[in-house]
Amino acid sequence: QIVLTQSPAIMSASPGQKVTMTCSASSSVSYMHWYQQKSGTSPKRWIYDTSKLASGVPARFSGSGSATSYSLTITSMQAEDAATYYCQQWSSNPLTFGAGTKLELKR
């Protein structure tokens, strides 16, 4: 099974700051997908097929990467972006998730 390692586990960013989090796969995958989860709510699909934004996701978000190295970037952190972000692969069975990166707002 492919193990996804997310880094950092926890991070904080001030409003307007650029944010980058990474997801490393133990074997090469074709695409990476990202989910956003806020406390007490179900995860929302956020970025799919590495770089495509799900409906309603602000353009300040982007995804990139290939093979074993992927990233999610926010060009300008906003308060509503504080959440936990999970990467996911389904290139190889079983489908697997990373442990998440918790993004906190620094005031």
Swiss-Prot record:
Q: Where is this region: Framework-4?
A: 97-106
Which residue pairs form cystines in this protein?
Answer: C23-C87
The record's section on SMART domains has: IG, IGv
Q: Where is this region: Framework-2?
A: 34-48
- Please give the SUPFAM superfamilies that the UniProt record associates with this protein: Immunoglobulin (SSF48726)
Q: Where is this region: Complementarity-determining-1?
A: 24-33
Tell me yes or no: is Disulfide bond among this UniProt entry's keywords.
yes
Which residue ranges are recorded for the region named Complementarity-determining-3?
88-96
Quick one: where's region Complementarity-determining-2? 49-55
Q: Region (Framework-3) spans which residues?
A: 56-87
GO biological process: one example: adaptive immune response
UniProt KW keywords: Adaptive immunity, Disulfide bond, Hybridoma, Immunity, Immunoglobulin
Positions of region (Framework-1): 1-23
Q: Which PANTHER family match?
A: IMMUNOGLOBULIN LIGHT CHAIN (PTHR23267)
Q: What is the stated purpose of this protein? A: Anti-2-phenyl oxazolone (PHOX) Antibody.
**UniProt-recorded name of the protein:** Ig kappa chain V-VI region NQ2-17.4.1
Q: Which organism is it from?
A: Mus musculus
